[in-house]
Amino acid sequence: MLPLGVVIPTKNSMPYLPRHVEGLRPWLDLASEVVVVDSFSTDGTVDFLRANLAHPHLRFTSHPPGLYASWNHGIAQITSRYVVLATTGDTVTREGICRLVEVAESLACDVVISNPTFCDLSGQIQPDLQWPIGDVIAMLGVKQPRRLHPFEAVIFATVNSTDALTGSSASDVFRTEMLKRYPFPTDFGTSGDAMWGLMHAAEVAWGVVPERFSTFLLHPTNASIAEKRSFLTARRADAVLRAAMDAWRRSGAITEQTLPRALWEDLMTWLTAYYDAKAAFDQNRRNPVPWILNPSAWRNRIRRKRSAAQLQRLKRVALFRKWQ
């Protein structure tokens, strides 16, 4: 048995549960405890899990709808050293779970991330999404598990800020105490895990595993309209990162030697330019006139592309500069 708790968040998840339970069975006996957090399902989700999920320390709890609030509620129930968020439809192998926990222990990590294989609803393998974890593995040439330096985590989170550094939570393990100290934010719509990575990139210990042993199911979101809309009024990633960096420099998590202020300001300048251009282009696309016929839209699209290219250039400078 591993020092691992499992949180299974559900909300009218019945279409994905047969596949999900089938994926859990080969390794669930390794877990010390299992907590199902259901958000008032009306489609038989809880009944199905009660009938088909077996574990000596299985508990059911309920929480009002809200993706990350439900995650936090489930994590609060876990007493094991580590936790995996087994989101419905996503799977991981027995060997993979053991590997993630082993790396967390051996490298003293707060979170260990890995890249899943992407599948559609029919089970067919799909092309990779360009997630931050893939960028980390490719850019650093990761061939075996390694722990990221805090400045590396900050750079990858910054340059890939439109996605979550954690990738798929079902492909990772987290130190439970760390998630209780730094819960997922609930005011960023469906991007709470991405913003969590930005907020805490430098103050948690990240481990990276290059092997693949999990799957991520590509399916429509189950988020409520209110949850989706909350992102529209949330702070942007550049504002979140500026506030976080101020705190990291005060605490010493990031120093002038590891990430010079001038280089960071260049990154922030281009990140802000990227989000300004993205916001303008998104507005162009909402107009009745097709954006392709709008010269302003083309200019904003080019600005966005140029800003993204500059962020990639600065990423290479930051990662591979020669430290004094």
Model-found features: residue ranges?
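A conserved acidic beta->alpha catalytic loop
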Residues: 38-47, 87
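Catalytic core of nucleotide-sugar-dependent glycosyltransferases
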Residues: 139, 212-220, 225-256, 278-290
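Short aromatic/hydrophobic "clamp" motif used to bind/position activated sugar donors
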Residues: 83
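Conserved nucleotide-sugar donor-binding catalytic segment
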Residues: 138-230
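Short, well-formed alpha-helical segments that are part of the catalytic scaffolds
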Residues: 12-26
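Acidic helix N-cap motif at the loop->helix transition within catalytic regions
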Residues: 15-18, 43-51, 95
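Glycine-rich, basic loop-to-helix element that forms the pyrophosphate-binding segment
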Residues: 62-78, 88-91
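Conserved donor NDP-sugar-binding/catalytic core segment of glycosyltransferases
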Residues: 97-138
